[in-house]
Amino acid sequence: MDAPASFSLGAMGPLLRKLDSLLVAPEIRLPKPLKEGIELLKEDLEEIGVSLVEHSVVDSPTHKARFWMDEVRDLSYHIEDCIDTMFSMRSGGDDGKPRSERRHKVGRAKIDGFSKKPKPCTRMARIAELRALVREASERLERYQLGDVCGSSSPVVFTADGRARPLHHGVSANLVGVDEFKTKLNRWLSDEEGPHLKVAAIVGPAGIGKTALATELYRDHRWQFECRAFVRASRKPDMQRLLGGILSQVQRRQRSSDAYADSTVQSLIDNLREHLQDRRYLIIIDGLWETAVWNIANSAFPDVNSFSRILITADIEQVALECCGYKYDYIMRMEPLGSLDSKKVFFNKVFGSEDQCPPELKEVSNTILEKCGGLPLAIISIAGLLGSQPENPVLWDYVTKYLCSSLGTNPTLKDVVKETLNLSYNSLPHPFKTCLLYLGMYPDGHIMLKADLMKQWSAEGFVSANEAKDTEEIVDKYFDELVNRGILEPVEINKNGKVLSCTLHHAVHDLVMPKFNDDKFTMSVDYSQTITGPSTMVRRLSLHFSSTRYATKPAGIILSRVRSLAFFGLLNCMPCIGEFKLLRVLILEFWGSHGEQRSLNLIPVCRLFQLRYLKTSGDVVVQLPAQISGLQYLETLEIDARVSAVPFDLVHLPNLLHLQLQDETKLPDGIGCMRSLRTLQYFDLGNNSVDNLRGLGELTNLQDLHLSYSAPSSNEGLMINLNAITSSLSRLSNLKSLILSPGAISMVIFFDISSIISVVPVFLQRLELLPPICIFCRLPKSIGQLHKLCILKVSVRELLTTDIDNLTGLPSLTVLSLYAQTAPEGRFIFKDGTLPVLKYFKFGCGELCLAFMAGAMPNLQRLKLVFNIRKSEKYRHTLFGIEHLVSLQDIATRIGVDTSTGESDRRAAESAFKETVNKHPRCLRSSLQWVVSTEEESHPLEKQHHKREKGSSAGHGVLEKESVEDSEKNTDRVQTLLSPQLSNMESVVESALTGQRTKIVVKVHMPCGKSRAKAMALAASVNGVDSVEITGEDKDRLVVVGRGIDPVRLVALLREKCGLAELLMVELVEKEKTQLAGGKKGAYKKHPTYNLSPFDYVEYPPSAPIMQDINPCSTM
């Protein structure tokens, strides 16, 4: 039996294959009697396995048959556990301790559950016991008279062939029939409705398109608001996470809602009110179920006459009315789609357009659409099913008959959603159903990453590789098919249109939840001790303990039998990992306030010899065992948290495919032994040894590599590292994705990595070389040889008009982010045929100098431009040929202005932008954002360029010297920015402003590597700064040295962009420092080649919500 593990067959397929392997494995010498016993056990299992398969395809089996199938499935798990216990050898030390620390030496390898290797006679007796259990199951099959399969007719199962046309999620073209609602809501969002805070609601039944409309409005109008947030609520929302998600977005921080773990609900409310005071904000709460949730959240939103708006979506009209204060004018009741709009959605999904629908299917299509009742979710679900095999007449006939019989003449909209989703589910092949039912491990409304699900499905054994495709390709197909059928709801989509994260629509959740219980596949326990699923023999257990400190596991669960554990909640509520002896999948996601307890003890995992997947995330410190090489089956190790120490034998895990640790983590020497690795993130070039850098070249199976640089080094050290990594990359022939990012750099550094481009594999698909450490002098010509490249993000100091020709050799490029520090004398001209499949183009430069010829970028959908304007510049004719971009849908522009730019300049630039957009034959979604182009948008090299142009000795970059009035305003703000003990430092501040060399220490909230990189980049961009360093035990002290730095302005900038910032010290530097921490010269010597692209790190405000786990749209 080649079947994978599944909800219907249990572990029968993997068990039979495992017995086969035992019988033929040359390294396992079985005594003849034991071998014969295993052969007989296998024969007995095959016999009942055939009956199990026959009964599993019956739509509604009898109670006796269901009972027997449950018993056999459980027996398959039990026997596989016994086989694993008998034949899987333990190696390594107890509890992960080094051999030198053990009190008692262990002379022989141990087996889980046994103190020593069992004797052959013991194993033969155990095999005999297992055979007896199988015979009993076979006898019950006969006693229950289940030999002849009976029950209702089996559902028709249709295997997807991959031809379904996915919807382009998030694109306005997919929203049909909502023009009236959009017009009304657009007016409500505008200033015409008055300055007071307004609350509106979109109401309608499940599947009618409320979330899609709210997302569309958010995309269109977010730029009009200084603060904005889009969050998703669930039926039992954790208010701490919900409010934390809103706060993280309105503050525009690169942090998740979990970063507010120690904050109480009241403190989050207070912080939100303080931050939103006197600001215009837009808050969208999607899927509100209870007014109690609204009453708490609403207390965080001040009404300050700032034209702020709040939008909610709800299924229940009474909830919407209470949120809107019973103002019926602000209730938008969505109605089902009309006939024409329904046809547009349906035919576009199944055939591409109505014109491509065969004539013989027109009538049956109309019948199906009539039964769908105009509900978008129902239409998409049925269209996704039919689109998998659009030319299969049996499928069309089956769908039509099912809908006609189950929905009758006047079905309710609720019945329509239920039956269409039920049809889509029943038509799924068993492996697809298994993967869907597995999502019962996650809380209702949880955002799930596609990459995580794929690895978990693989670790659970839900897929079996074949000669044509490996496991990763198969699970990718499963995921995409569940999305295409409307069963999984996309949340985050990248620029290529690929779904990165998803959630279960609550209507789908309601459909599959009973199936979780019926098939005894998973069991969920929440903080209220509510049990979802069977409480007898649990194989997959999910604990949701996020709302109480004293939640405990319910009684009656045998933890030693659990194969998969997912924990969501408080650290001090998590059961001991050591009790779960047979774990294969371990998911730990910590929420809420942990108090003083921050340490997560994962030392017992060294005894989980069947473990295949381990992921943990949260604001905790993870303690791993000193030795981990006993986990011979481990495929995925992802720790999104701080690690106290990495096991020294990590490099000896033979089956590890995916390794992800936070940057700044030093891996043990010998990484070249990890030849099975496919994913490595992050590998820190500054913290790892040169031997490890060279060892990377041995990882010939590596496909995804994310490099970071988080430690300072001498120029000599940088060159050694560069040579080592260049040599290694030249040998990674299977590499598909390469990313190099700054990480949590503690010093501003720069080195030329042009040599890397010349050695990367020609089949590379993704290349991101991010500033500040990756700034090319010129665009490397060798980039044009990477013909398979799909994603390219790169920054250069100087980009010549002829360099664009290097990109014409990239026929597969779909995403291009390009930043140039210096504008060319001419224009960048994209000619006919250039970048034929490009969908997203982001271009940043000091001046806008682009031209598109007819035929250029024929598939470009989104265009993002970043440039500066200055006083009295001419703004017309800065962007040529936008009308030639025939597929363009969105254009976003971010324009930097300095203090010399007047209102007339802004109006002129805005008028020119609108005029350019209006040239396009289509009605484009457009946005224009103004930012201060002080040092936020300039780079040190740009500043030097402007200094030379102006002949200024003081040199203030793009900005002219502050006026006396501005200086006085800053002096007035000194008291609010200084810490209390520095209230008498005004004289030192004045000395700093006069140009004397000054050392400034600021305490900044920098919880992660990205936030540190951002804070350093901000500080480094300020006029007069010579060096920037991060110090302090918690890495929260920013030390800035330079001349003429305004401390008040520096702190104000950091406070605005990073949240919390406090000035701790300002002192005059008498003489040049000569020692770095660690004894190296040049502590305060500024690296003049440091540059920061506003492209990826200094983007104010972000183009979309930072919270990826609740973000309805992705702009990357």
Curated annotation (Swiss-Prot):
One of the record's GO cellular component terms: cytoplasm
Record note on quaternary structure: Forms homodimer or heterodimer with RGA4 through its coiled coil (CC) domain. Interacts with AVR1-Pia and AVR-CO39 through its C-terminal part containing the HMA-like domain.
Region (HMA-like domain): 1000-1070
Family, as annotated: Belongs to the disease resistance NB-LRR family.
Superkingdom, natural source: Eukaryota
Organism expressing this protein natively: Oryza sativa subsp. japonica
SS bond list: none
Database matches in Gene3D superfamilies: 1.20.5.4130, 3.30.70.100, Helical domain of apoptotic protease-activating factors, P-loop containing nucleotide triphosphate hydrolases, Ribonuclease Inhibitor
Principal location: cytoplasm
Protein name: Disease resistance protein RGA5
Domain (HMA): residue spans on this chain: 997-1066
Domain NB-ARC: 182-466
UniProt xrefs under PROSITE patterns: HMA_2
Pfam families for the chain: LRR_14, NB-ARC, Rx_N, WH_DRP
Domain notes: The HMA-like (RATX1) domain is responsible for the specific recognition of AVR effectors.
GO biological process: defense response to bacterium; innate immune response-activating signaling pathway; plant-type hypersensitive response
GO molecular function: ADP binding; ATP binding; metal ion binding
Keyword Cytoplasm (UniProt): yes
The LRR repeat ranges on this chain: 608-631, 633-653, 654-675, 677-701, 732-755, 786-808, 810-830, 835-857, 858-882
Regions of compositional bias (Basic and acidic residues) in chain numbering: 958-971
Chain spans, region Disordered: 935-971
Subcellular location(s) of the protein: Cytoplasm
InterPro entries for this protein: Apaf_helical, Disease_R_plants, HMA_dom, LRR_dom_sf, LRR_R13L4/SHOC2-like, NB-ARC, P-loop_NTPase, Rx_N
Start and end residues of each stretch annotated as Structured coiled coil (CC) domain: 1-177
Keyword entries, A-Z: ATP-binding, Coiled coil, Cytoplasm, Leucine-rich repeat, Nucleotide-binding, Plant defense, Repeat
Known function: Disease resistance (R) protein that recognizes the AVR-Pia and AVR1-CO39 effector avirulence proteins from M.oryzae. Resistance proteins guard the plant against pathogens that contain an appropriate avirulence protein via an indirect interaction with this avirulence protein. That triggers a defense system including the hypersensitive response, which restricts the pathogen growth. Contribution of RGA4 is required to recognize the effector avirulence proteins AVR-Pia and AVR1-CO39 from M.oryzae. Acts as a repressor of the RGA4-mediated cell death activation.
Tissue-wise expression: Expressed in leaves.
